[in-house]
Amino acid sequence: MALVVQKYGGSSLESAERIRNVAERIVATKKAGNDVVVVCSAMGDTTDELLELAAAVNPVPPAREMDMLLTAGERISNALVAMAIESLGAEAQSFTGSQAGVLTTERHGNARIVDVTPGRVREALDEGKICIVAGFQGVNKETRDVTTLGRGGSDTTAVALAAALNADVCEIYSDVDGVYTADPRIVPNAQKLEKLSFEEMLELAAVGSKILVLRSVEYARAFNVPLRVRSSYSNDPGTLIAGSMEDIPVEEAVLTGVATDKSEAKVTVLGISDKPGEAAKVFRALADAEINIDMVLQNVSSVEDGTTDITFTCPRADGRRAMEILKKLQVQGNWTNVLYDDQVDKVSLVGAGMKSHPGVTAEFMEALRDVNVNIELISTSEIRISVLIREDDLDAAARALHEQFQLGGEDEAVVYAGTGR
């Protein structure tokens, strides 16, 4: 008997009809001879609606109370799914994150999972019940306060539970039926991938793919939890994410896909002193504010005045905070200026085959040249090339790269209505 963990996103649970459909799928999995644990996101746009409601009563709500509010969304869908399962004649028991043993750091709004002790879930499974766990949430062991795991936290909850329960597979259901070679909404002939290594999925998640959040893939790789990305709208087997890139024979290594990211902004510090430790001050201040930095470029030092310019990207959502921090440092460091640009996007090419194909970088640049796309920043890894470009050029760049590396097929991809979650 296999143990299957299934996670359903908000689009899969957005209405009573969708919840009943999900319940039927869950019960069918149980009847096939599996033990089943289900992790639920909040219904549809519930989380966004709760955020708007909070802002209406308090523009700067206390972080603890915000977590108390937001976790209600998952508890609602949790209970409704359990009710729907019971209506089909199967036994179900719902759990909050804390009841399921999800222990976290105490940082409200973006806590990290430190341990999972799913004793009550194991007991319910032993009794033959289907277990329904609220995603996106946990509890801090010291304060006993409810915490949330940040956007995409339900994915991480599902993978963490799968690891703690030694599940055979963790299935992530949304409104897309797998991982594609590109966003089908941008590249119509994008093709679904049957299998990816953890490293390839990590790179895709890190550079913009919204199918899985980065933290969930990191957790899956660390504990070797096989992931399967599937659609709740079809019975397609989806995409399997398992194994290491090192296990792929060199002859079989391929270019995986093109990822796009519309969430970054570019910040440039002009006229900073080109001395040891000056750049460190910039990035330490941002790190202390928990602002993630992605691409970084430092220009050649000016011989005349011993200064340089530093350009980097950060999440657009953190842009205002980053600028406030840097404007204060500008006065102290006597910098020339700090510039902010949110009219930029990022496009990336990912694939294990990049290691064994020396001409990939040249072809990448030539493909963008041919559609008149200018490159502002470049970053690379062993299996990835990313560039920052003007936001108006993103779609053309993605299509050009997809065509250049022959990643498409003859048929157009099937796109279900929804957001990819």
Curated annotation (Swiss-Prot):
Q: Where does ATP bind?
A: 7-10, 41, 174-175, 180-185, 210
EC class of this enzyme? transferase
Q: Which GO terms describe its molecular function?
A: aspartate kinase activity; ATP binding
Record-linked InterPro entries: AceGlu_kinase-like_sf, ACT-like_dom_sf, ACT_Aspartokinase, ACT_dom, AKii-LysC-BS, Asp/Glu/Uridylate_kinase, Asp_kin_monofn, Asp_kinase
Cite the entry's keywords alphabetically: Amino-acid biosynthesis, ATP-binding, Diaminopimelate biosynthesis, Kinase, Lysine biosynthesis, Nucleotide-binding, Repeat, Transferase
Q: Where is this site: Contribution to the catalysis?
A: 7, 74
Q: Which Gene3D superfamilies match?
A: 3.30.70.260, Acetylglutamate kinase-like
Report the activity regulation comment: Low feedback inhibition by lysine and threonine. The decreased sensitivity of C.flavum, as compared to C.glutamicum, is probably due to the Asp-345-Gly sequence difference.
One GO term describing the cellular component = cytosol
Which biological pathway? Amino-acid biosynthesis; L-lysine biosynthesis via DAP pathway; (S)-tetrahydrodipicolinate from L-aspartate: step 1/4; Amino-acid biosynthesis; L-methionine biosynthesis via de novo pathway; L-homoserine from L-aspartate: step 1/3; Amino-acid biosynthesis; L-threonine biosynthesis; L-threonine from L-aspartate: step 1/5
Q: Name one GO biological process term.
A: lysine biosynthetic process via diaminopimelate
Provide the reaction this enzyme catalyses.
Answer: L-aspartate + ATP = 4-phospho-L-aspartate + ADP
Domain ACT, by residue range, is: 267-343, 349-421
Might you give the EC number(s) for this enzyme? 2.7.2.4
Q: What does this protein do?
A: Catalyzes the phosphorylation of the beta-carboxyl group of aspartic acid with ATP to yield 4-phospho-L-aspartate, which is involved in the branched biosynthetic pathway leading to the biosynthesis of amino acids lysine, threonine, isoleucine and methionine.
What is the name attached to this protein's record?
Answer: Aspartokinase
